[in-house]
Regions:
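N-proximal low-complexity "stem/linker" segments adjacent to membrane-targeting elements
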Residues: 1-11
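Short, acidic, metal-binding catalytic loop of nucleotide-sugar glycosyltransferases
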Residues: 12-24
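Active-site-proximal specificity loops/subdomain of glycosyltransferases
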Residues: 25-75, 85-89
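Conserved donor-nucleotide/metal-binding helix-loop-beta segment in metal-dependent transferases, i.e.
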Residues: 86-111
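Conserved nucleotide-sugar donor-binding
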Residues: 87-89, 115-132
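A recurrent flexible, glycine/aromatic-enriched loop bordering the glycosyltransferase active site
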Residues: 107-121, 135-138
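C-terminal catalytic/acceptor-binding lobe
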Residues: 124, 136-181
Length: 181
């Protein structure tokens, strides 16, 4: 599940997306559309009836998990931002060691333990819980997810780096400064 924005130009630049061999979606939001979602199977883009800005991210992610659950009912989901470069072989190799319901790069804020938003993993059990997430808890999507999943089995797993020099050894590189996009 790749979180993007309907005006984003980054998706076309992410070559790793073309190598995905399992069902995936690219999430966009449009609060003005009538339908709860519009899904284009060819492009994998699902446009959800929700805000498409930073403050609306908790609602967008909740709606995204609901769509993915109803459409695909997957065993797990990796939530990935559109400013990530991902080594898919390494990412899927981690599944062998992820014996948890929620995993990612650990953060702590406002008394909430959560995994940073650019890339995290949730199990089937967690997907079911996230469909009913309280979106009013925080404007930050990753904090809202962490609060919602506070009673699940968690595992710190450093999926990504923000340091380009570690990019060849890491599972993913977070281009948060948009140097390469």
């Amino acid at each position: 599940m790749i979180c993007s924005h309907r005006n984003s130009k980054t998706i076309s630049k992410l070559q790793w997306i073309k190598k995905i061999k399992c069902p995936y979606v690219i999430l966009n939001g449009n609060p003005d559309q009538e339908e709860e979602f519009i899904y284009d199977e060819e492009t994998h883009v699902v446009t959800l009836k929700c805000p498409d800005d930073y403050i609306g991210l908790p609602h967008k992610i909740k709606s995204g998990f609901r769509f993915v659950k109803n459409r695909f009912d997957p065993d797990f989901v990796f939530k990935i931002d559109d400013d990530m470069f991902v080594d898919l072989d390494k990412l899927f190799e981690t599944l062998k060691s992820l014996d948890s319901d929620y995993a990612g790069t650990i953060c702590y804020k406002n008394r909430v333990l959560y995994f940073a938003g650019p890339l995290y993993y949730v199990s089937h059990k967690s997907i079911n819980i996230l469909q009913d997430m309280d979106v009013s808890y925080s404007d930050a999507e990753d904090i809202s997810v962490g609060n919602c999943l506070k009673y699940t089995i968690r595992k710190h797993f450093p999926f990504y780096t923000d340091d380009i020099s570690e990019g060849s050894t890491a599972i993913a590189y977070h281009d948060h400064k948009r140097q390469f996009l």
